[in-house]
C-alpha cells in the first residue's frame, strides 16, 4: 500500500471536487484499510441537508474549522457517521464516507456510513482529528482513477434533489 497521506491542500478545494477524487483512495483506521467506494457532499449553510445549515453550534464547529479534520456524529441513536471537512476554514462543508471496500486485515464491502463506522469502531472519540498527520487515521493516495456516477443523496429529508452522491460503478 502507498504510504502517501493526502495533504491538507487536497481538502482545501471545492467539496464536489474533493468528493469525486476521494473515490478510490485508501481510508486507513487503526488496523483497517479500505478503498473508498461511495461518498456524499454537504456544502454550506445554504444546503438544507448540511448539519451547518442552521449555523455554528458545538456539534458543527468542526465543519467550520480546518479542512482535513474528521467530523463524526451519532444518528438514529445507534450509528456513527464519518465525514471529512473540506473547503476553507470558516465555510462549513464536508464529505460523508458512505462506502468502503476493506482490503486489510480482511476483505469485505461496507455499504452505508453507519455500518462502516460500526465495523471499523469509529466513534465520537474520533471526532475533530486531523487526518493529514497520523498514519493511524488518514486517507492515502492510491493513484487509481475510477469511473463513478453522481446520483441524488439518500437517507435525508431535505436537499434530495442535489446529485451530490458519488459512487464507483
UniProtKB/Swiss-Prot annotation:
It is an enzyme of class 3 (hydrolase). GO terms for molecular function: alkylbase DNA N-glycosylase activity; DNA binding. Keywords: DNA damage, DNA repair, Hydrolase. Its EC number is 3.2.2.-. Disulfide bonds: none annotated. One of its GO terms (biological process) is base-excision repair. Pfam families: Pur_DNA_glyco. CDD domains: AAG. SUPFAM superfamilies: FMT C-terminal domain-like (SSF50486). The keyword Hydrolase applies. Belongs to the DNA glycosylase MPG family. This is Putative 3-methyladenine DNA glycosylase. The lineage of its organism: Bacteria, Pseudomonadati, Pseudomonadota, Alphaproteobacteria, Rickettsiales.
Amino acid at each position: 500500500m502507498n504510504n502517501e497521506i493526502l495533504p491538507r491542500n487536497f481538502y482545501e478545494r471545492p467539496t464536489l471536487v474533493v468528493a469525486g477524487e476521494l473515490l478510490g483512495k485508501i481510508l486507513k483506521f487503526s488496523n483497517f484499510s479500505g478503498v473508498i467506494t461511495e461518498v456524499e457532499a454537504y456544502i454550506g449553510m445554504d444546503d438544507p441537508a448540511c448539519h451547518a445549515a442552521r449555523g455554528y453550534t458545538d456539534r458543527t464547529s468542526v465543519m467550520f474549522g480546518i479542512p482535513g479534520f474528521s467530523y463524526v456524529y451519532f444518528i438514529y441513536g445507534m450509528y456513527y457517521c464519518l465525514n471529512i471537512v473540506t473547503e476553507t476554514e470558516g465555510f462549513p462543508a464536508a464529505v460523508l464516507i458512505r462506502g468502503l471496500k476493506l482490503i486489510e486485515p480482511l476483505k469485505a464491502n461496507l455499504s452505508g456510513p453507519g455500518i462502516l463506522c460500526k465495523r471499523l469502531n469509529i466513534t465520537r472519540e474520533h471526532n475533530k482529528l486531523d487526518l493529514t498527520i497520523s498514519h493511524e487515521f488518514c486517507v492515502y493516495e492510491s493513484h487509481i482513477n475510477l469511473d463513478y456516477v453522481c446520483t441524488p443523496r439518500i437517507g435525508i429529508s431535505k436537499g434530495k434533489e442535489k446529485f451530490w452522491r458519488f459512487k464507483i460503478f
